[in-house]
Amino acid sequence: MKTLFALLFLFTFSLVSAGDRTIRGTEELRAALRELKPGTTLRLAPGDYDGGHHVRGIANLTITALDPEDPPHFKGGANAWHFSRCEGLTLSHLRISGQSGNGLNLDDGGELDSLVGGITLENLEISEIGPQGNNDGIKCSGLENLTIRSCRITAWGGQGIDFVGCHRALITGCRFEGREGFSASAGIQLKGGTSEVMVEKCHFLNAGERPLNIGGSTGLAYFRPPGATFEAAGIVVRENIIEGSLCAAAFVGVDGVEFSGNTILFPEKWIFRILQETTESGFVPCRNVRVARNRIVFRRLQLRTDLNIGGNTAPETFVFAGNQWFAEDRPEASQPQLPVVEKDGIYGRDPR
């Protein structure tokens, strides 16, 4: 009887552990990718690995470091990794650099009405993507229930993180740092019908022209869901630090944003931008944004205007409340020119 139980235990253990593999080097990785099954965990040993890997339709895949203190480093390729329709994907403790396209590309395989869910990205280091052009650190299209946590993205050509038609997502505790020589249009961009996204506790340092591009401009064929009438809606941006760049945040074709509790330090041309870049029939004007309880430090000498307000927008629907505004070089000129009257604003007192 004891022998029977022992055999049953060994059989059960072998089933559980069969999908957990240790990988050493690019060739072992390529071989493992050819044999992938749902539920596989790949633990990658330290060292350099080639980029250029593509995985499609494998559910509950985990790719992580064998030693989180010495993560594997994926160098080069158009993309380090491209995952299409990989439900339940987890990537953690990986380094990625030197790609000519995107660092990571995750998508729905072009099935615009069928979102891919349950993806987690954490403790990733992504750098030197591009350097010039629409080359993203992390590109996400048609995903839902997505978490990006504790990632560091440095030097990219397009967006640090780019969401096109993604829903119910959290970006938390990440750092975005631009670098001279990389074109970097945005730190985070949320567009193409994206909704219900929270960005919190992130740090943006010279993170592109628009560290937070909430909304944007998307070709009609790429909206998820098809027929959406906004670039982004139901977005929460809270408790972030935003340093430098031409502006702190741009609201572009959005319908509902809460921007609160953030610290803004020394934007170079405007504090905020209110824009409408998608003007096709049926699209709502940029509207319904609440800017509250932020700490905003700037220099009058640097700013062209406090806000850049473009055409086809609805700035009268914005709410400003309880923000602390401080012009470091001219404290007496700290009160900004806003499109609506602010409630309980604080002006001329250094909030740092």
Please identify what each model-predicted range represents.
Residues 3-13:
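Sec-dependent N-terminal signal peptides
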Residues 11-22:
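Bacterial Sec-dependent signal peptides at the C-terminal "C-region" and cleavage site
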Residues 20-27, 43-46, 50-52, 56-104, ...:
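Right-handed parallel beta-helix/beta-spiral solenoid domain characteristic of secreted/periplasmic
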Residues 23, 63, 346-352:
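Bulky hydrophobic/aromatic "packing anchor" residues in well-ordered structure
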Residues 28-32:
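Short acidic active-site motifs
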Residues 33-40:
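Beta-strand repeat architectures
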Residues 54, 75-83, 97-118, 126-146, ...:
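Glycine- and acidic/polar-rich repeat regions and solenoidal domains
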